[in-house]
Amino acid sequence: MKLVEKTTTTEQDNGEDFCRTIIEVSEVNRNVFQAPGGEADPFRVVSGEELHLIPPLNFSMVDNGIFRSGFPDSANFSFLQTLGLRSIIYLCPEPYPESNLQFLKSNGIRLFQFGIEGNKEPFVNIPDHKIRMALKVLLDEKNHPVLIHCKRGKHRTGCLVGCLRKLQKWCLTSIFDEYQRFAAAKARVSDQRFMEIFDVSSFSHIPMSFSCSIR
């Protein structure tokens, strides 16, 4: 089996460019990817004799058993299966698409939805209580491996990850650097202010498996 990693640049609808990493697995035995009972797995993306593993937009590992990304679509399902996910934390208010729900059901993945509006206004308040509820789910190792995502994987996802970093005792400079790496030119002062004043004193437990904590 040979892994070939390709990075491509694609233009989004709004004119911005983003990078996707496509991992091609050559010489794949298709029988390996059959569902129980011998039926073909409908969520595997196979072209010829190659299996294409395409991460979602803005995909990255946050910590042991924690991942982040933009909204995954059917092209990303094969890649997500390799993560062995138990849970997804979804931070948008819109209903989850039926195709995504079917993917979760077929893979035994639990969905936690904390609907946060995707406001573009600079001074709109982020709902503190929803971030807290999402953070509690995130800290529970029974839910790992877990994927956090919103629409683009920038602002709402960035705020939740930033609050996790604060709990891990990261300095604000490092928290903001990570946030800005994903938000880029779309970084919002209101998001960074929210992370700065977010009170983590009510959270007393950080799983020992977390590798990015300052202990």
Swiss-Prot record:
Superkingdom assignment: Eukaryota
InterPro entries found in the cross-reference section: PFA-DSPs, Prot-tyrosine_phosphatase-like, Siw14-like, Tyr_Pase_AS, TYR_PHOSPHATASE_DUAL_dom
Regulation: Inhibited by manganese, calcium and zinc ions but not magnesium ions.
Site positions for Transition state stabilizer: R156
Known outcome of mutating T157A: Strongly reduces activity
Keyword set, alphabetical order: Hydrolase
EC numbers on record: 3.6.1.52
UniProt binding sites for 1D-myo-inositol hexakisphosphate: N125, I126, H129, K130
Main function: Cleaves the beta-phosphate at the 5-position of soluble inositol pyrophosphates. Has highest activity on 5-diphosphoinositol 1,2,3,4,6-pentakisphosphate (5-InsP(7)), 1,5-bis-diphosphoinositol 2,3,4,6-tetrakisphosphate (1,5-InsP(8)) and 3,5-InsP(8), but has weak activity against 1-diphosphoinositol 2,3,4,5,6-pentakisphosphate (1-InsP(7)). Dephosphorylates the phosphoinositides PI(3,4,5)P3, PI(3,5)P2, but not PI(3)P, PI(3,4)P2 or PI(4,5)P2. Possesses phosphotyrosine phosphatase activity in vitro, and can hydrolyze para-nitrophenyl phosphate, O-methylfluorescein phosphate, polyphosphate and ATP.
Subunit structure of this chain's protein: Homodimer and homohexamer; behaves as a monomer in solution.
Family classification: Belongs to the protein-tyrosine phosphatase family. Atypical dual-specificity phosphatase Siw14-like subfamily.
Identification of the protein by name: Inositol diphosphatase DSP1
